[in-house]
């Protein structure tokens, strides 16, 4: 896993990390922009995210003896990460395969008016996913939507924690956050 971590870090630095002046989704100004979608939608990046993510998720599930049925988060950032981890779970441990879902920013205005799409059912224990957390706002919105629909969020996994308070905001809700990288580990 160490080589996979190093390779994923190199790909994130090459494809996803930009310096300059940026306005983040949280509205905050930053000198660093991390667009994980570019790496997560690269086939090699997705494979590494899937393997590392599944390793981290499976370790947590087994150490705490959790029963988890599905994984997902707020579209669009969480989608390729959730799918990569779900695919890795099915490939590596078929008996523990995680179903995948996505959370819309708002409920659909037509049809069934659903906010959660894919393989999700009320009463399930799930993992919430995000690509990058800054304030934790997007992740908390996804958690709120999942809980409104009857899901039970057991923990969160994030590709990069910018270390700007988001992890603490999510954990204040009693939901542990597993970052694959932090700003510090990514940039060191």
List where the protein language model places each region.
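Active-site-facing substrate-recognition patch
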Residues: 1-63
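PRPP-dependent phosphoribosyltransferase catalytic core
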Residues: 2-11, 144-188
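Phosphate/pyrophosphate-binding loops at sites that engage ATP/ADP/AMP, CoA/4′-phosphopantetheine
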Residues: 53-68, 143, 147-149
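Active-site catalytic pocket residues across diverse enzymes, especially alpha/beta-hydrolases
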Residues: 61, 89, 93, 150
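Short glycine-rich phosphate-binding loop at a beta-alpha junction
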Residues: 64-77, 157
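Short, glycine/charge-rich flexible loops or terminal/linker lids adjacent to PRPP-binding catalytic cores
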Residues: 82-127, 137-140
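Acidic, divalent-metal-coordinating active-site segment for phosphoryl/phosphodiester hydrolysis
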Residues: 132-143, 166
């Amino acid at each position: 896993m160490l080589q996979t971590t190093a390779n994923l870090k190199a790909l994130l630095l090459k494809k996803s990390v930009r310096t300059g002046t940026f306005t983040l989704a949280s509205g905050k100004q930053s000198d660093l922009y991390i667009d994980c979608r570019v790496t997560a939608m690269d086939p090699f990046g997705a494979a590494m995210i899937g393997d590392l993510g599944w390793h981290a998720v499976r370790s947590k599930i087994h150490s705490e003896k959790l029963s988890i049925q599905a994984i997902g988060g707020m579209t669009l950032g969480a989608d390729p990460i959730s799918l990569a981890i779900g695919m890795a779970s099915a490939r590596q441990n078929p008996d523990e395969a995680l179903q995948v879902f996505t959370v819309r920013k708002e409920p659909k205005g037509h049809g069934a008016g659903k906010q959660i799409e894919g393989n999700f059912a009320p009463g399930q224990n799930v993992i919430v996913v995000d690509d990058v957390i800054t304030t934790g706002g997007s992740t908390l919105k996804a958690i709120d939507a999942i809980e409104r629909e009857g899901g039970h969020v057991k923990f969160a996994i994030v590709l990069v924690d910018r270390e700007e308070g988001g992890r603490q905001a999510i954990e204040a809700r009693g939901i542990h956050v597993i970052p694959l990288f932090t700003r510090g580990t990514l940039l060191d």
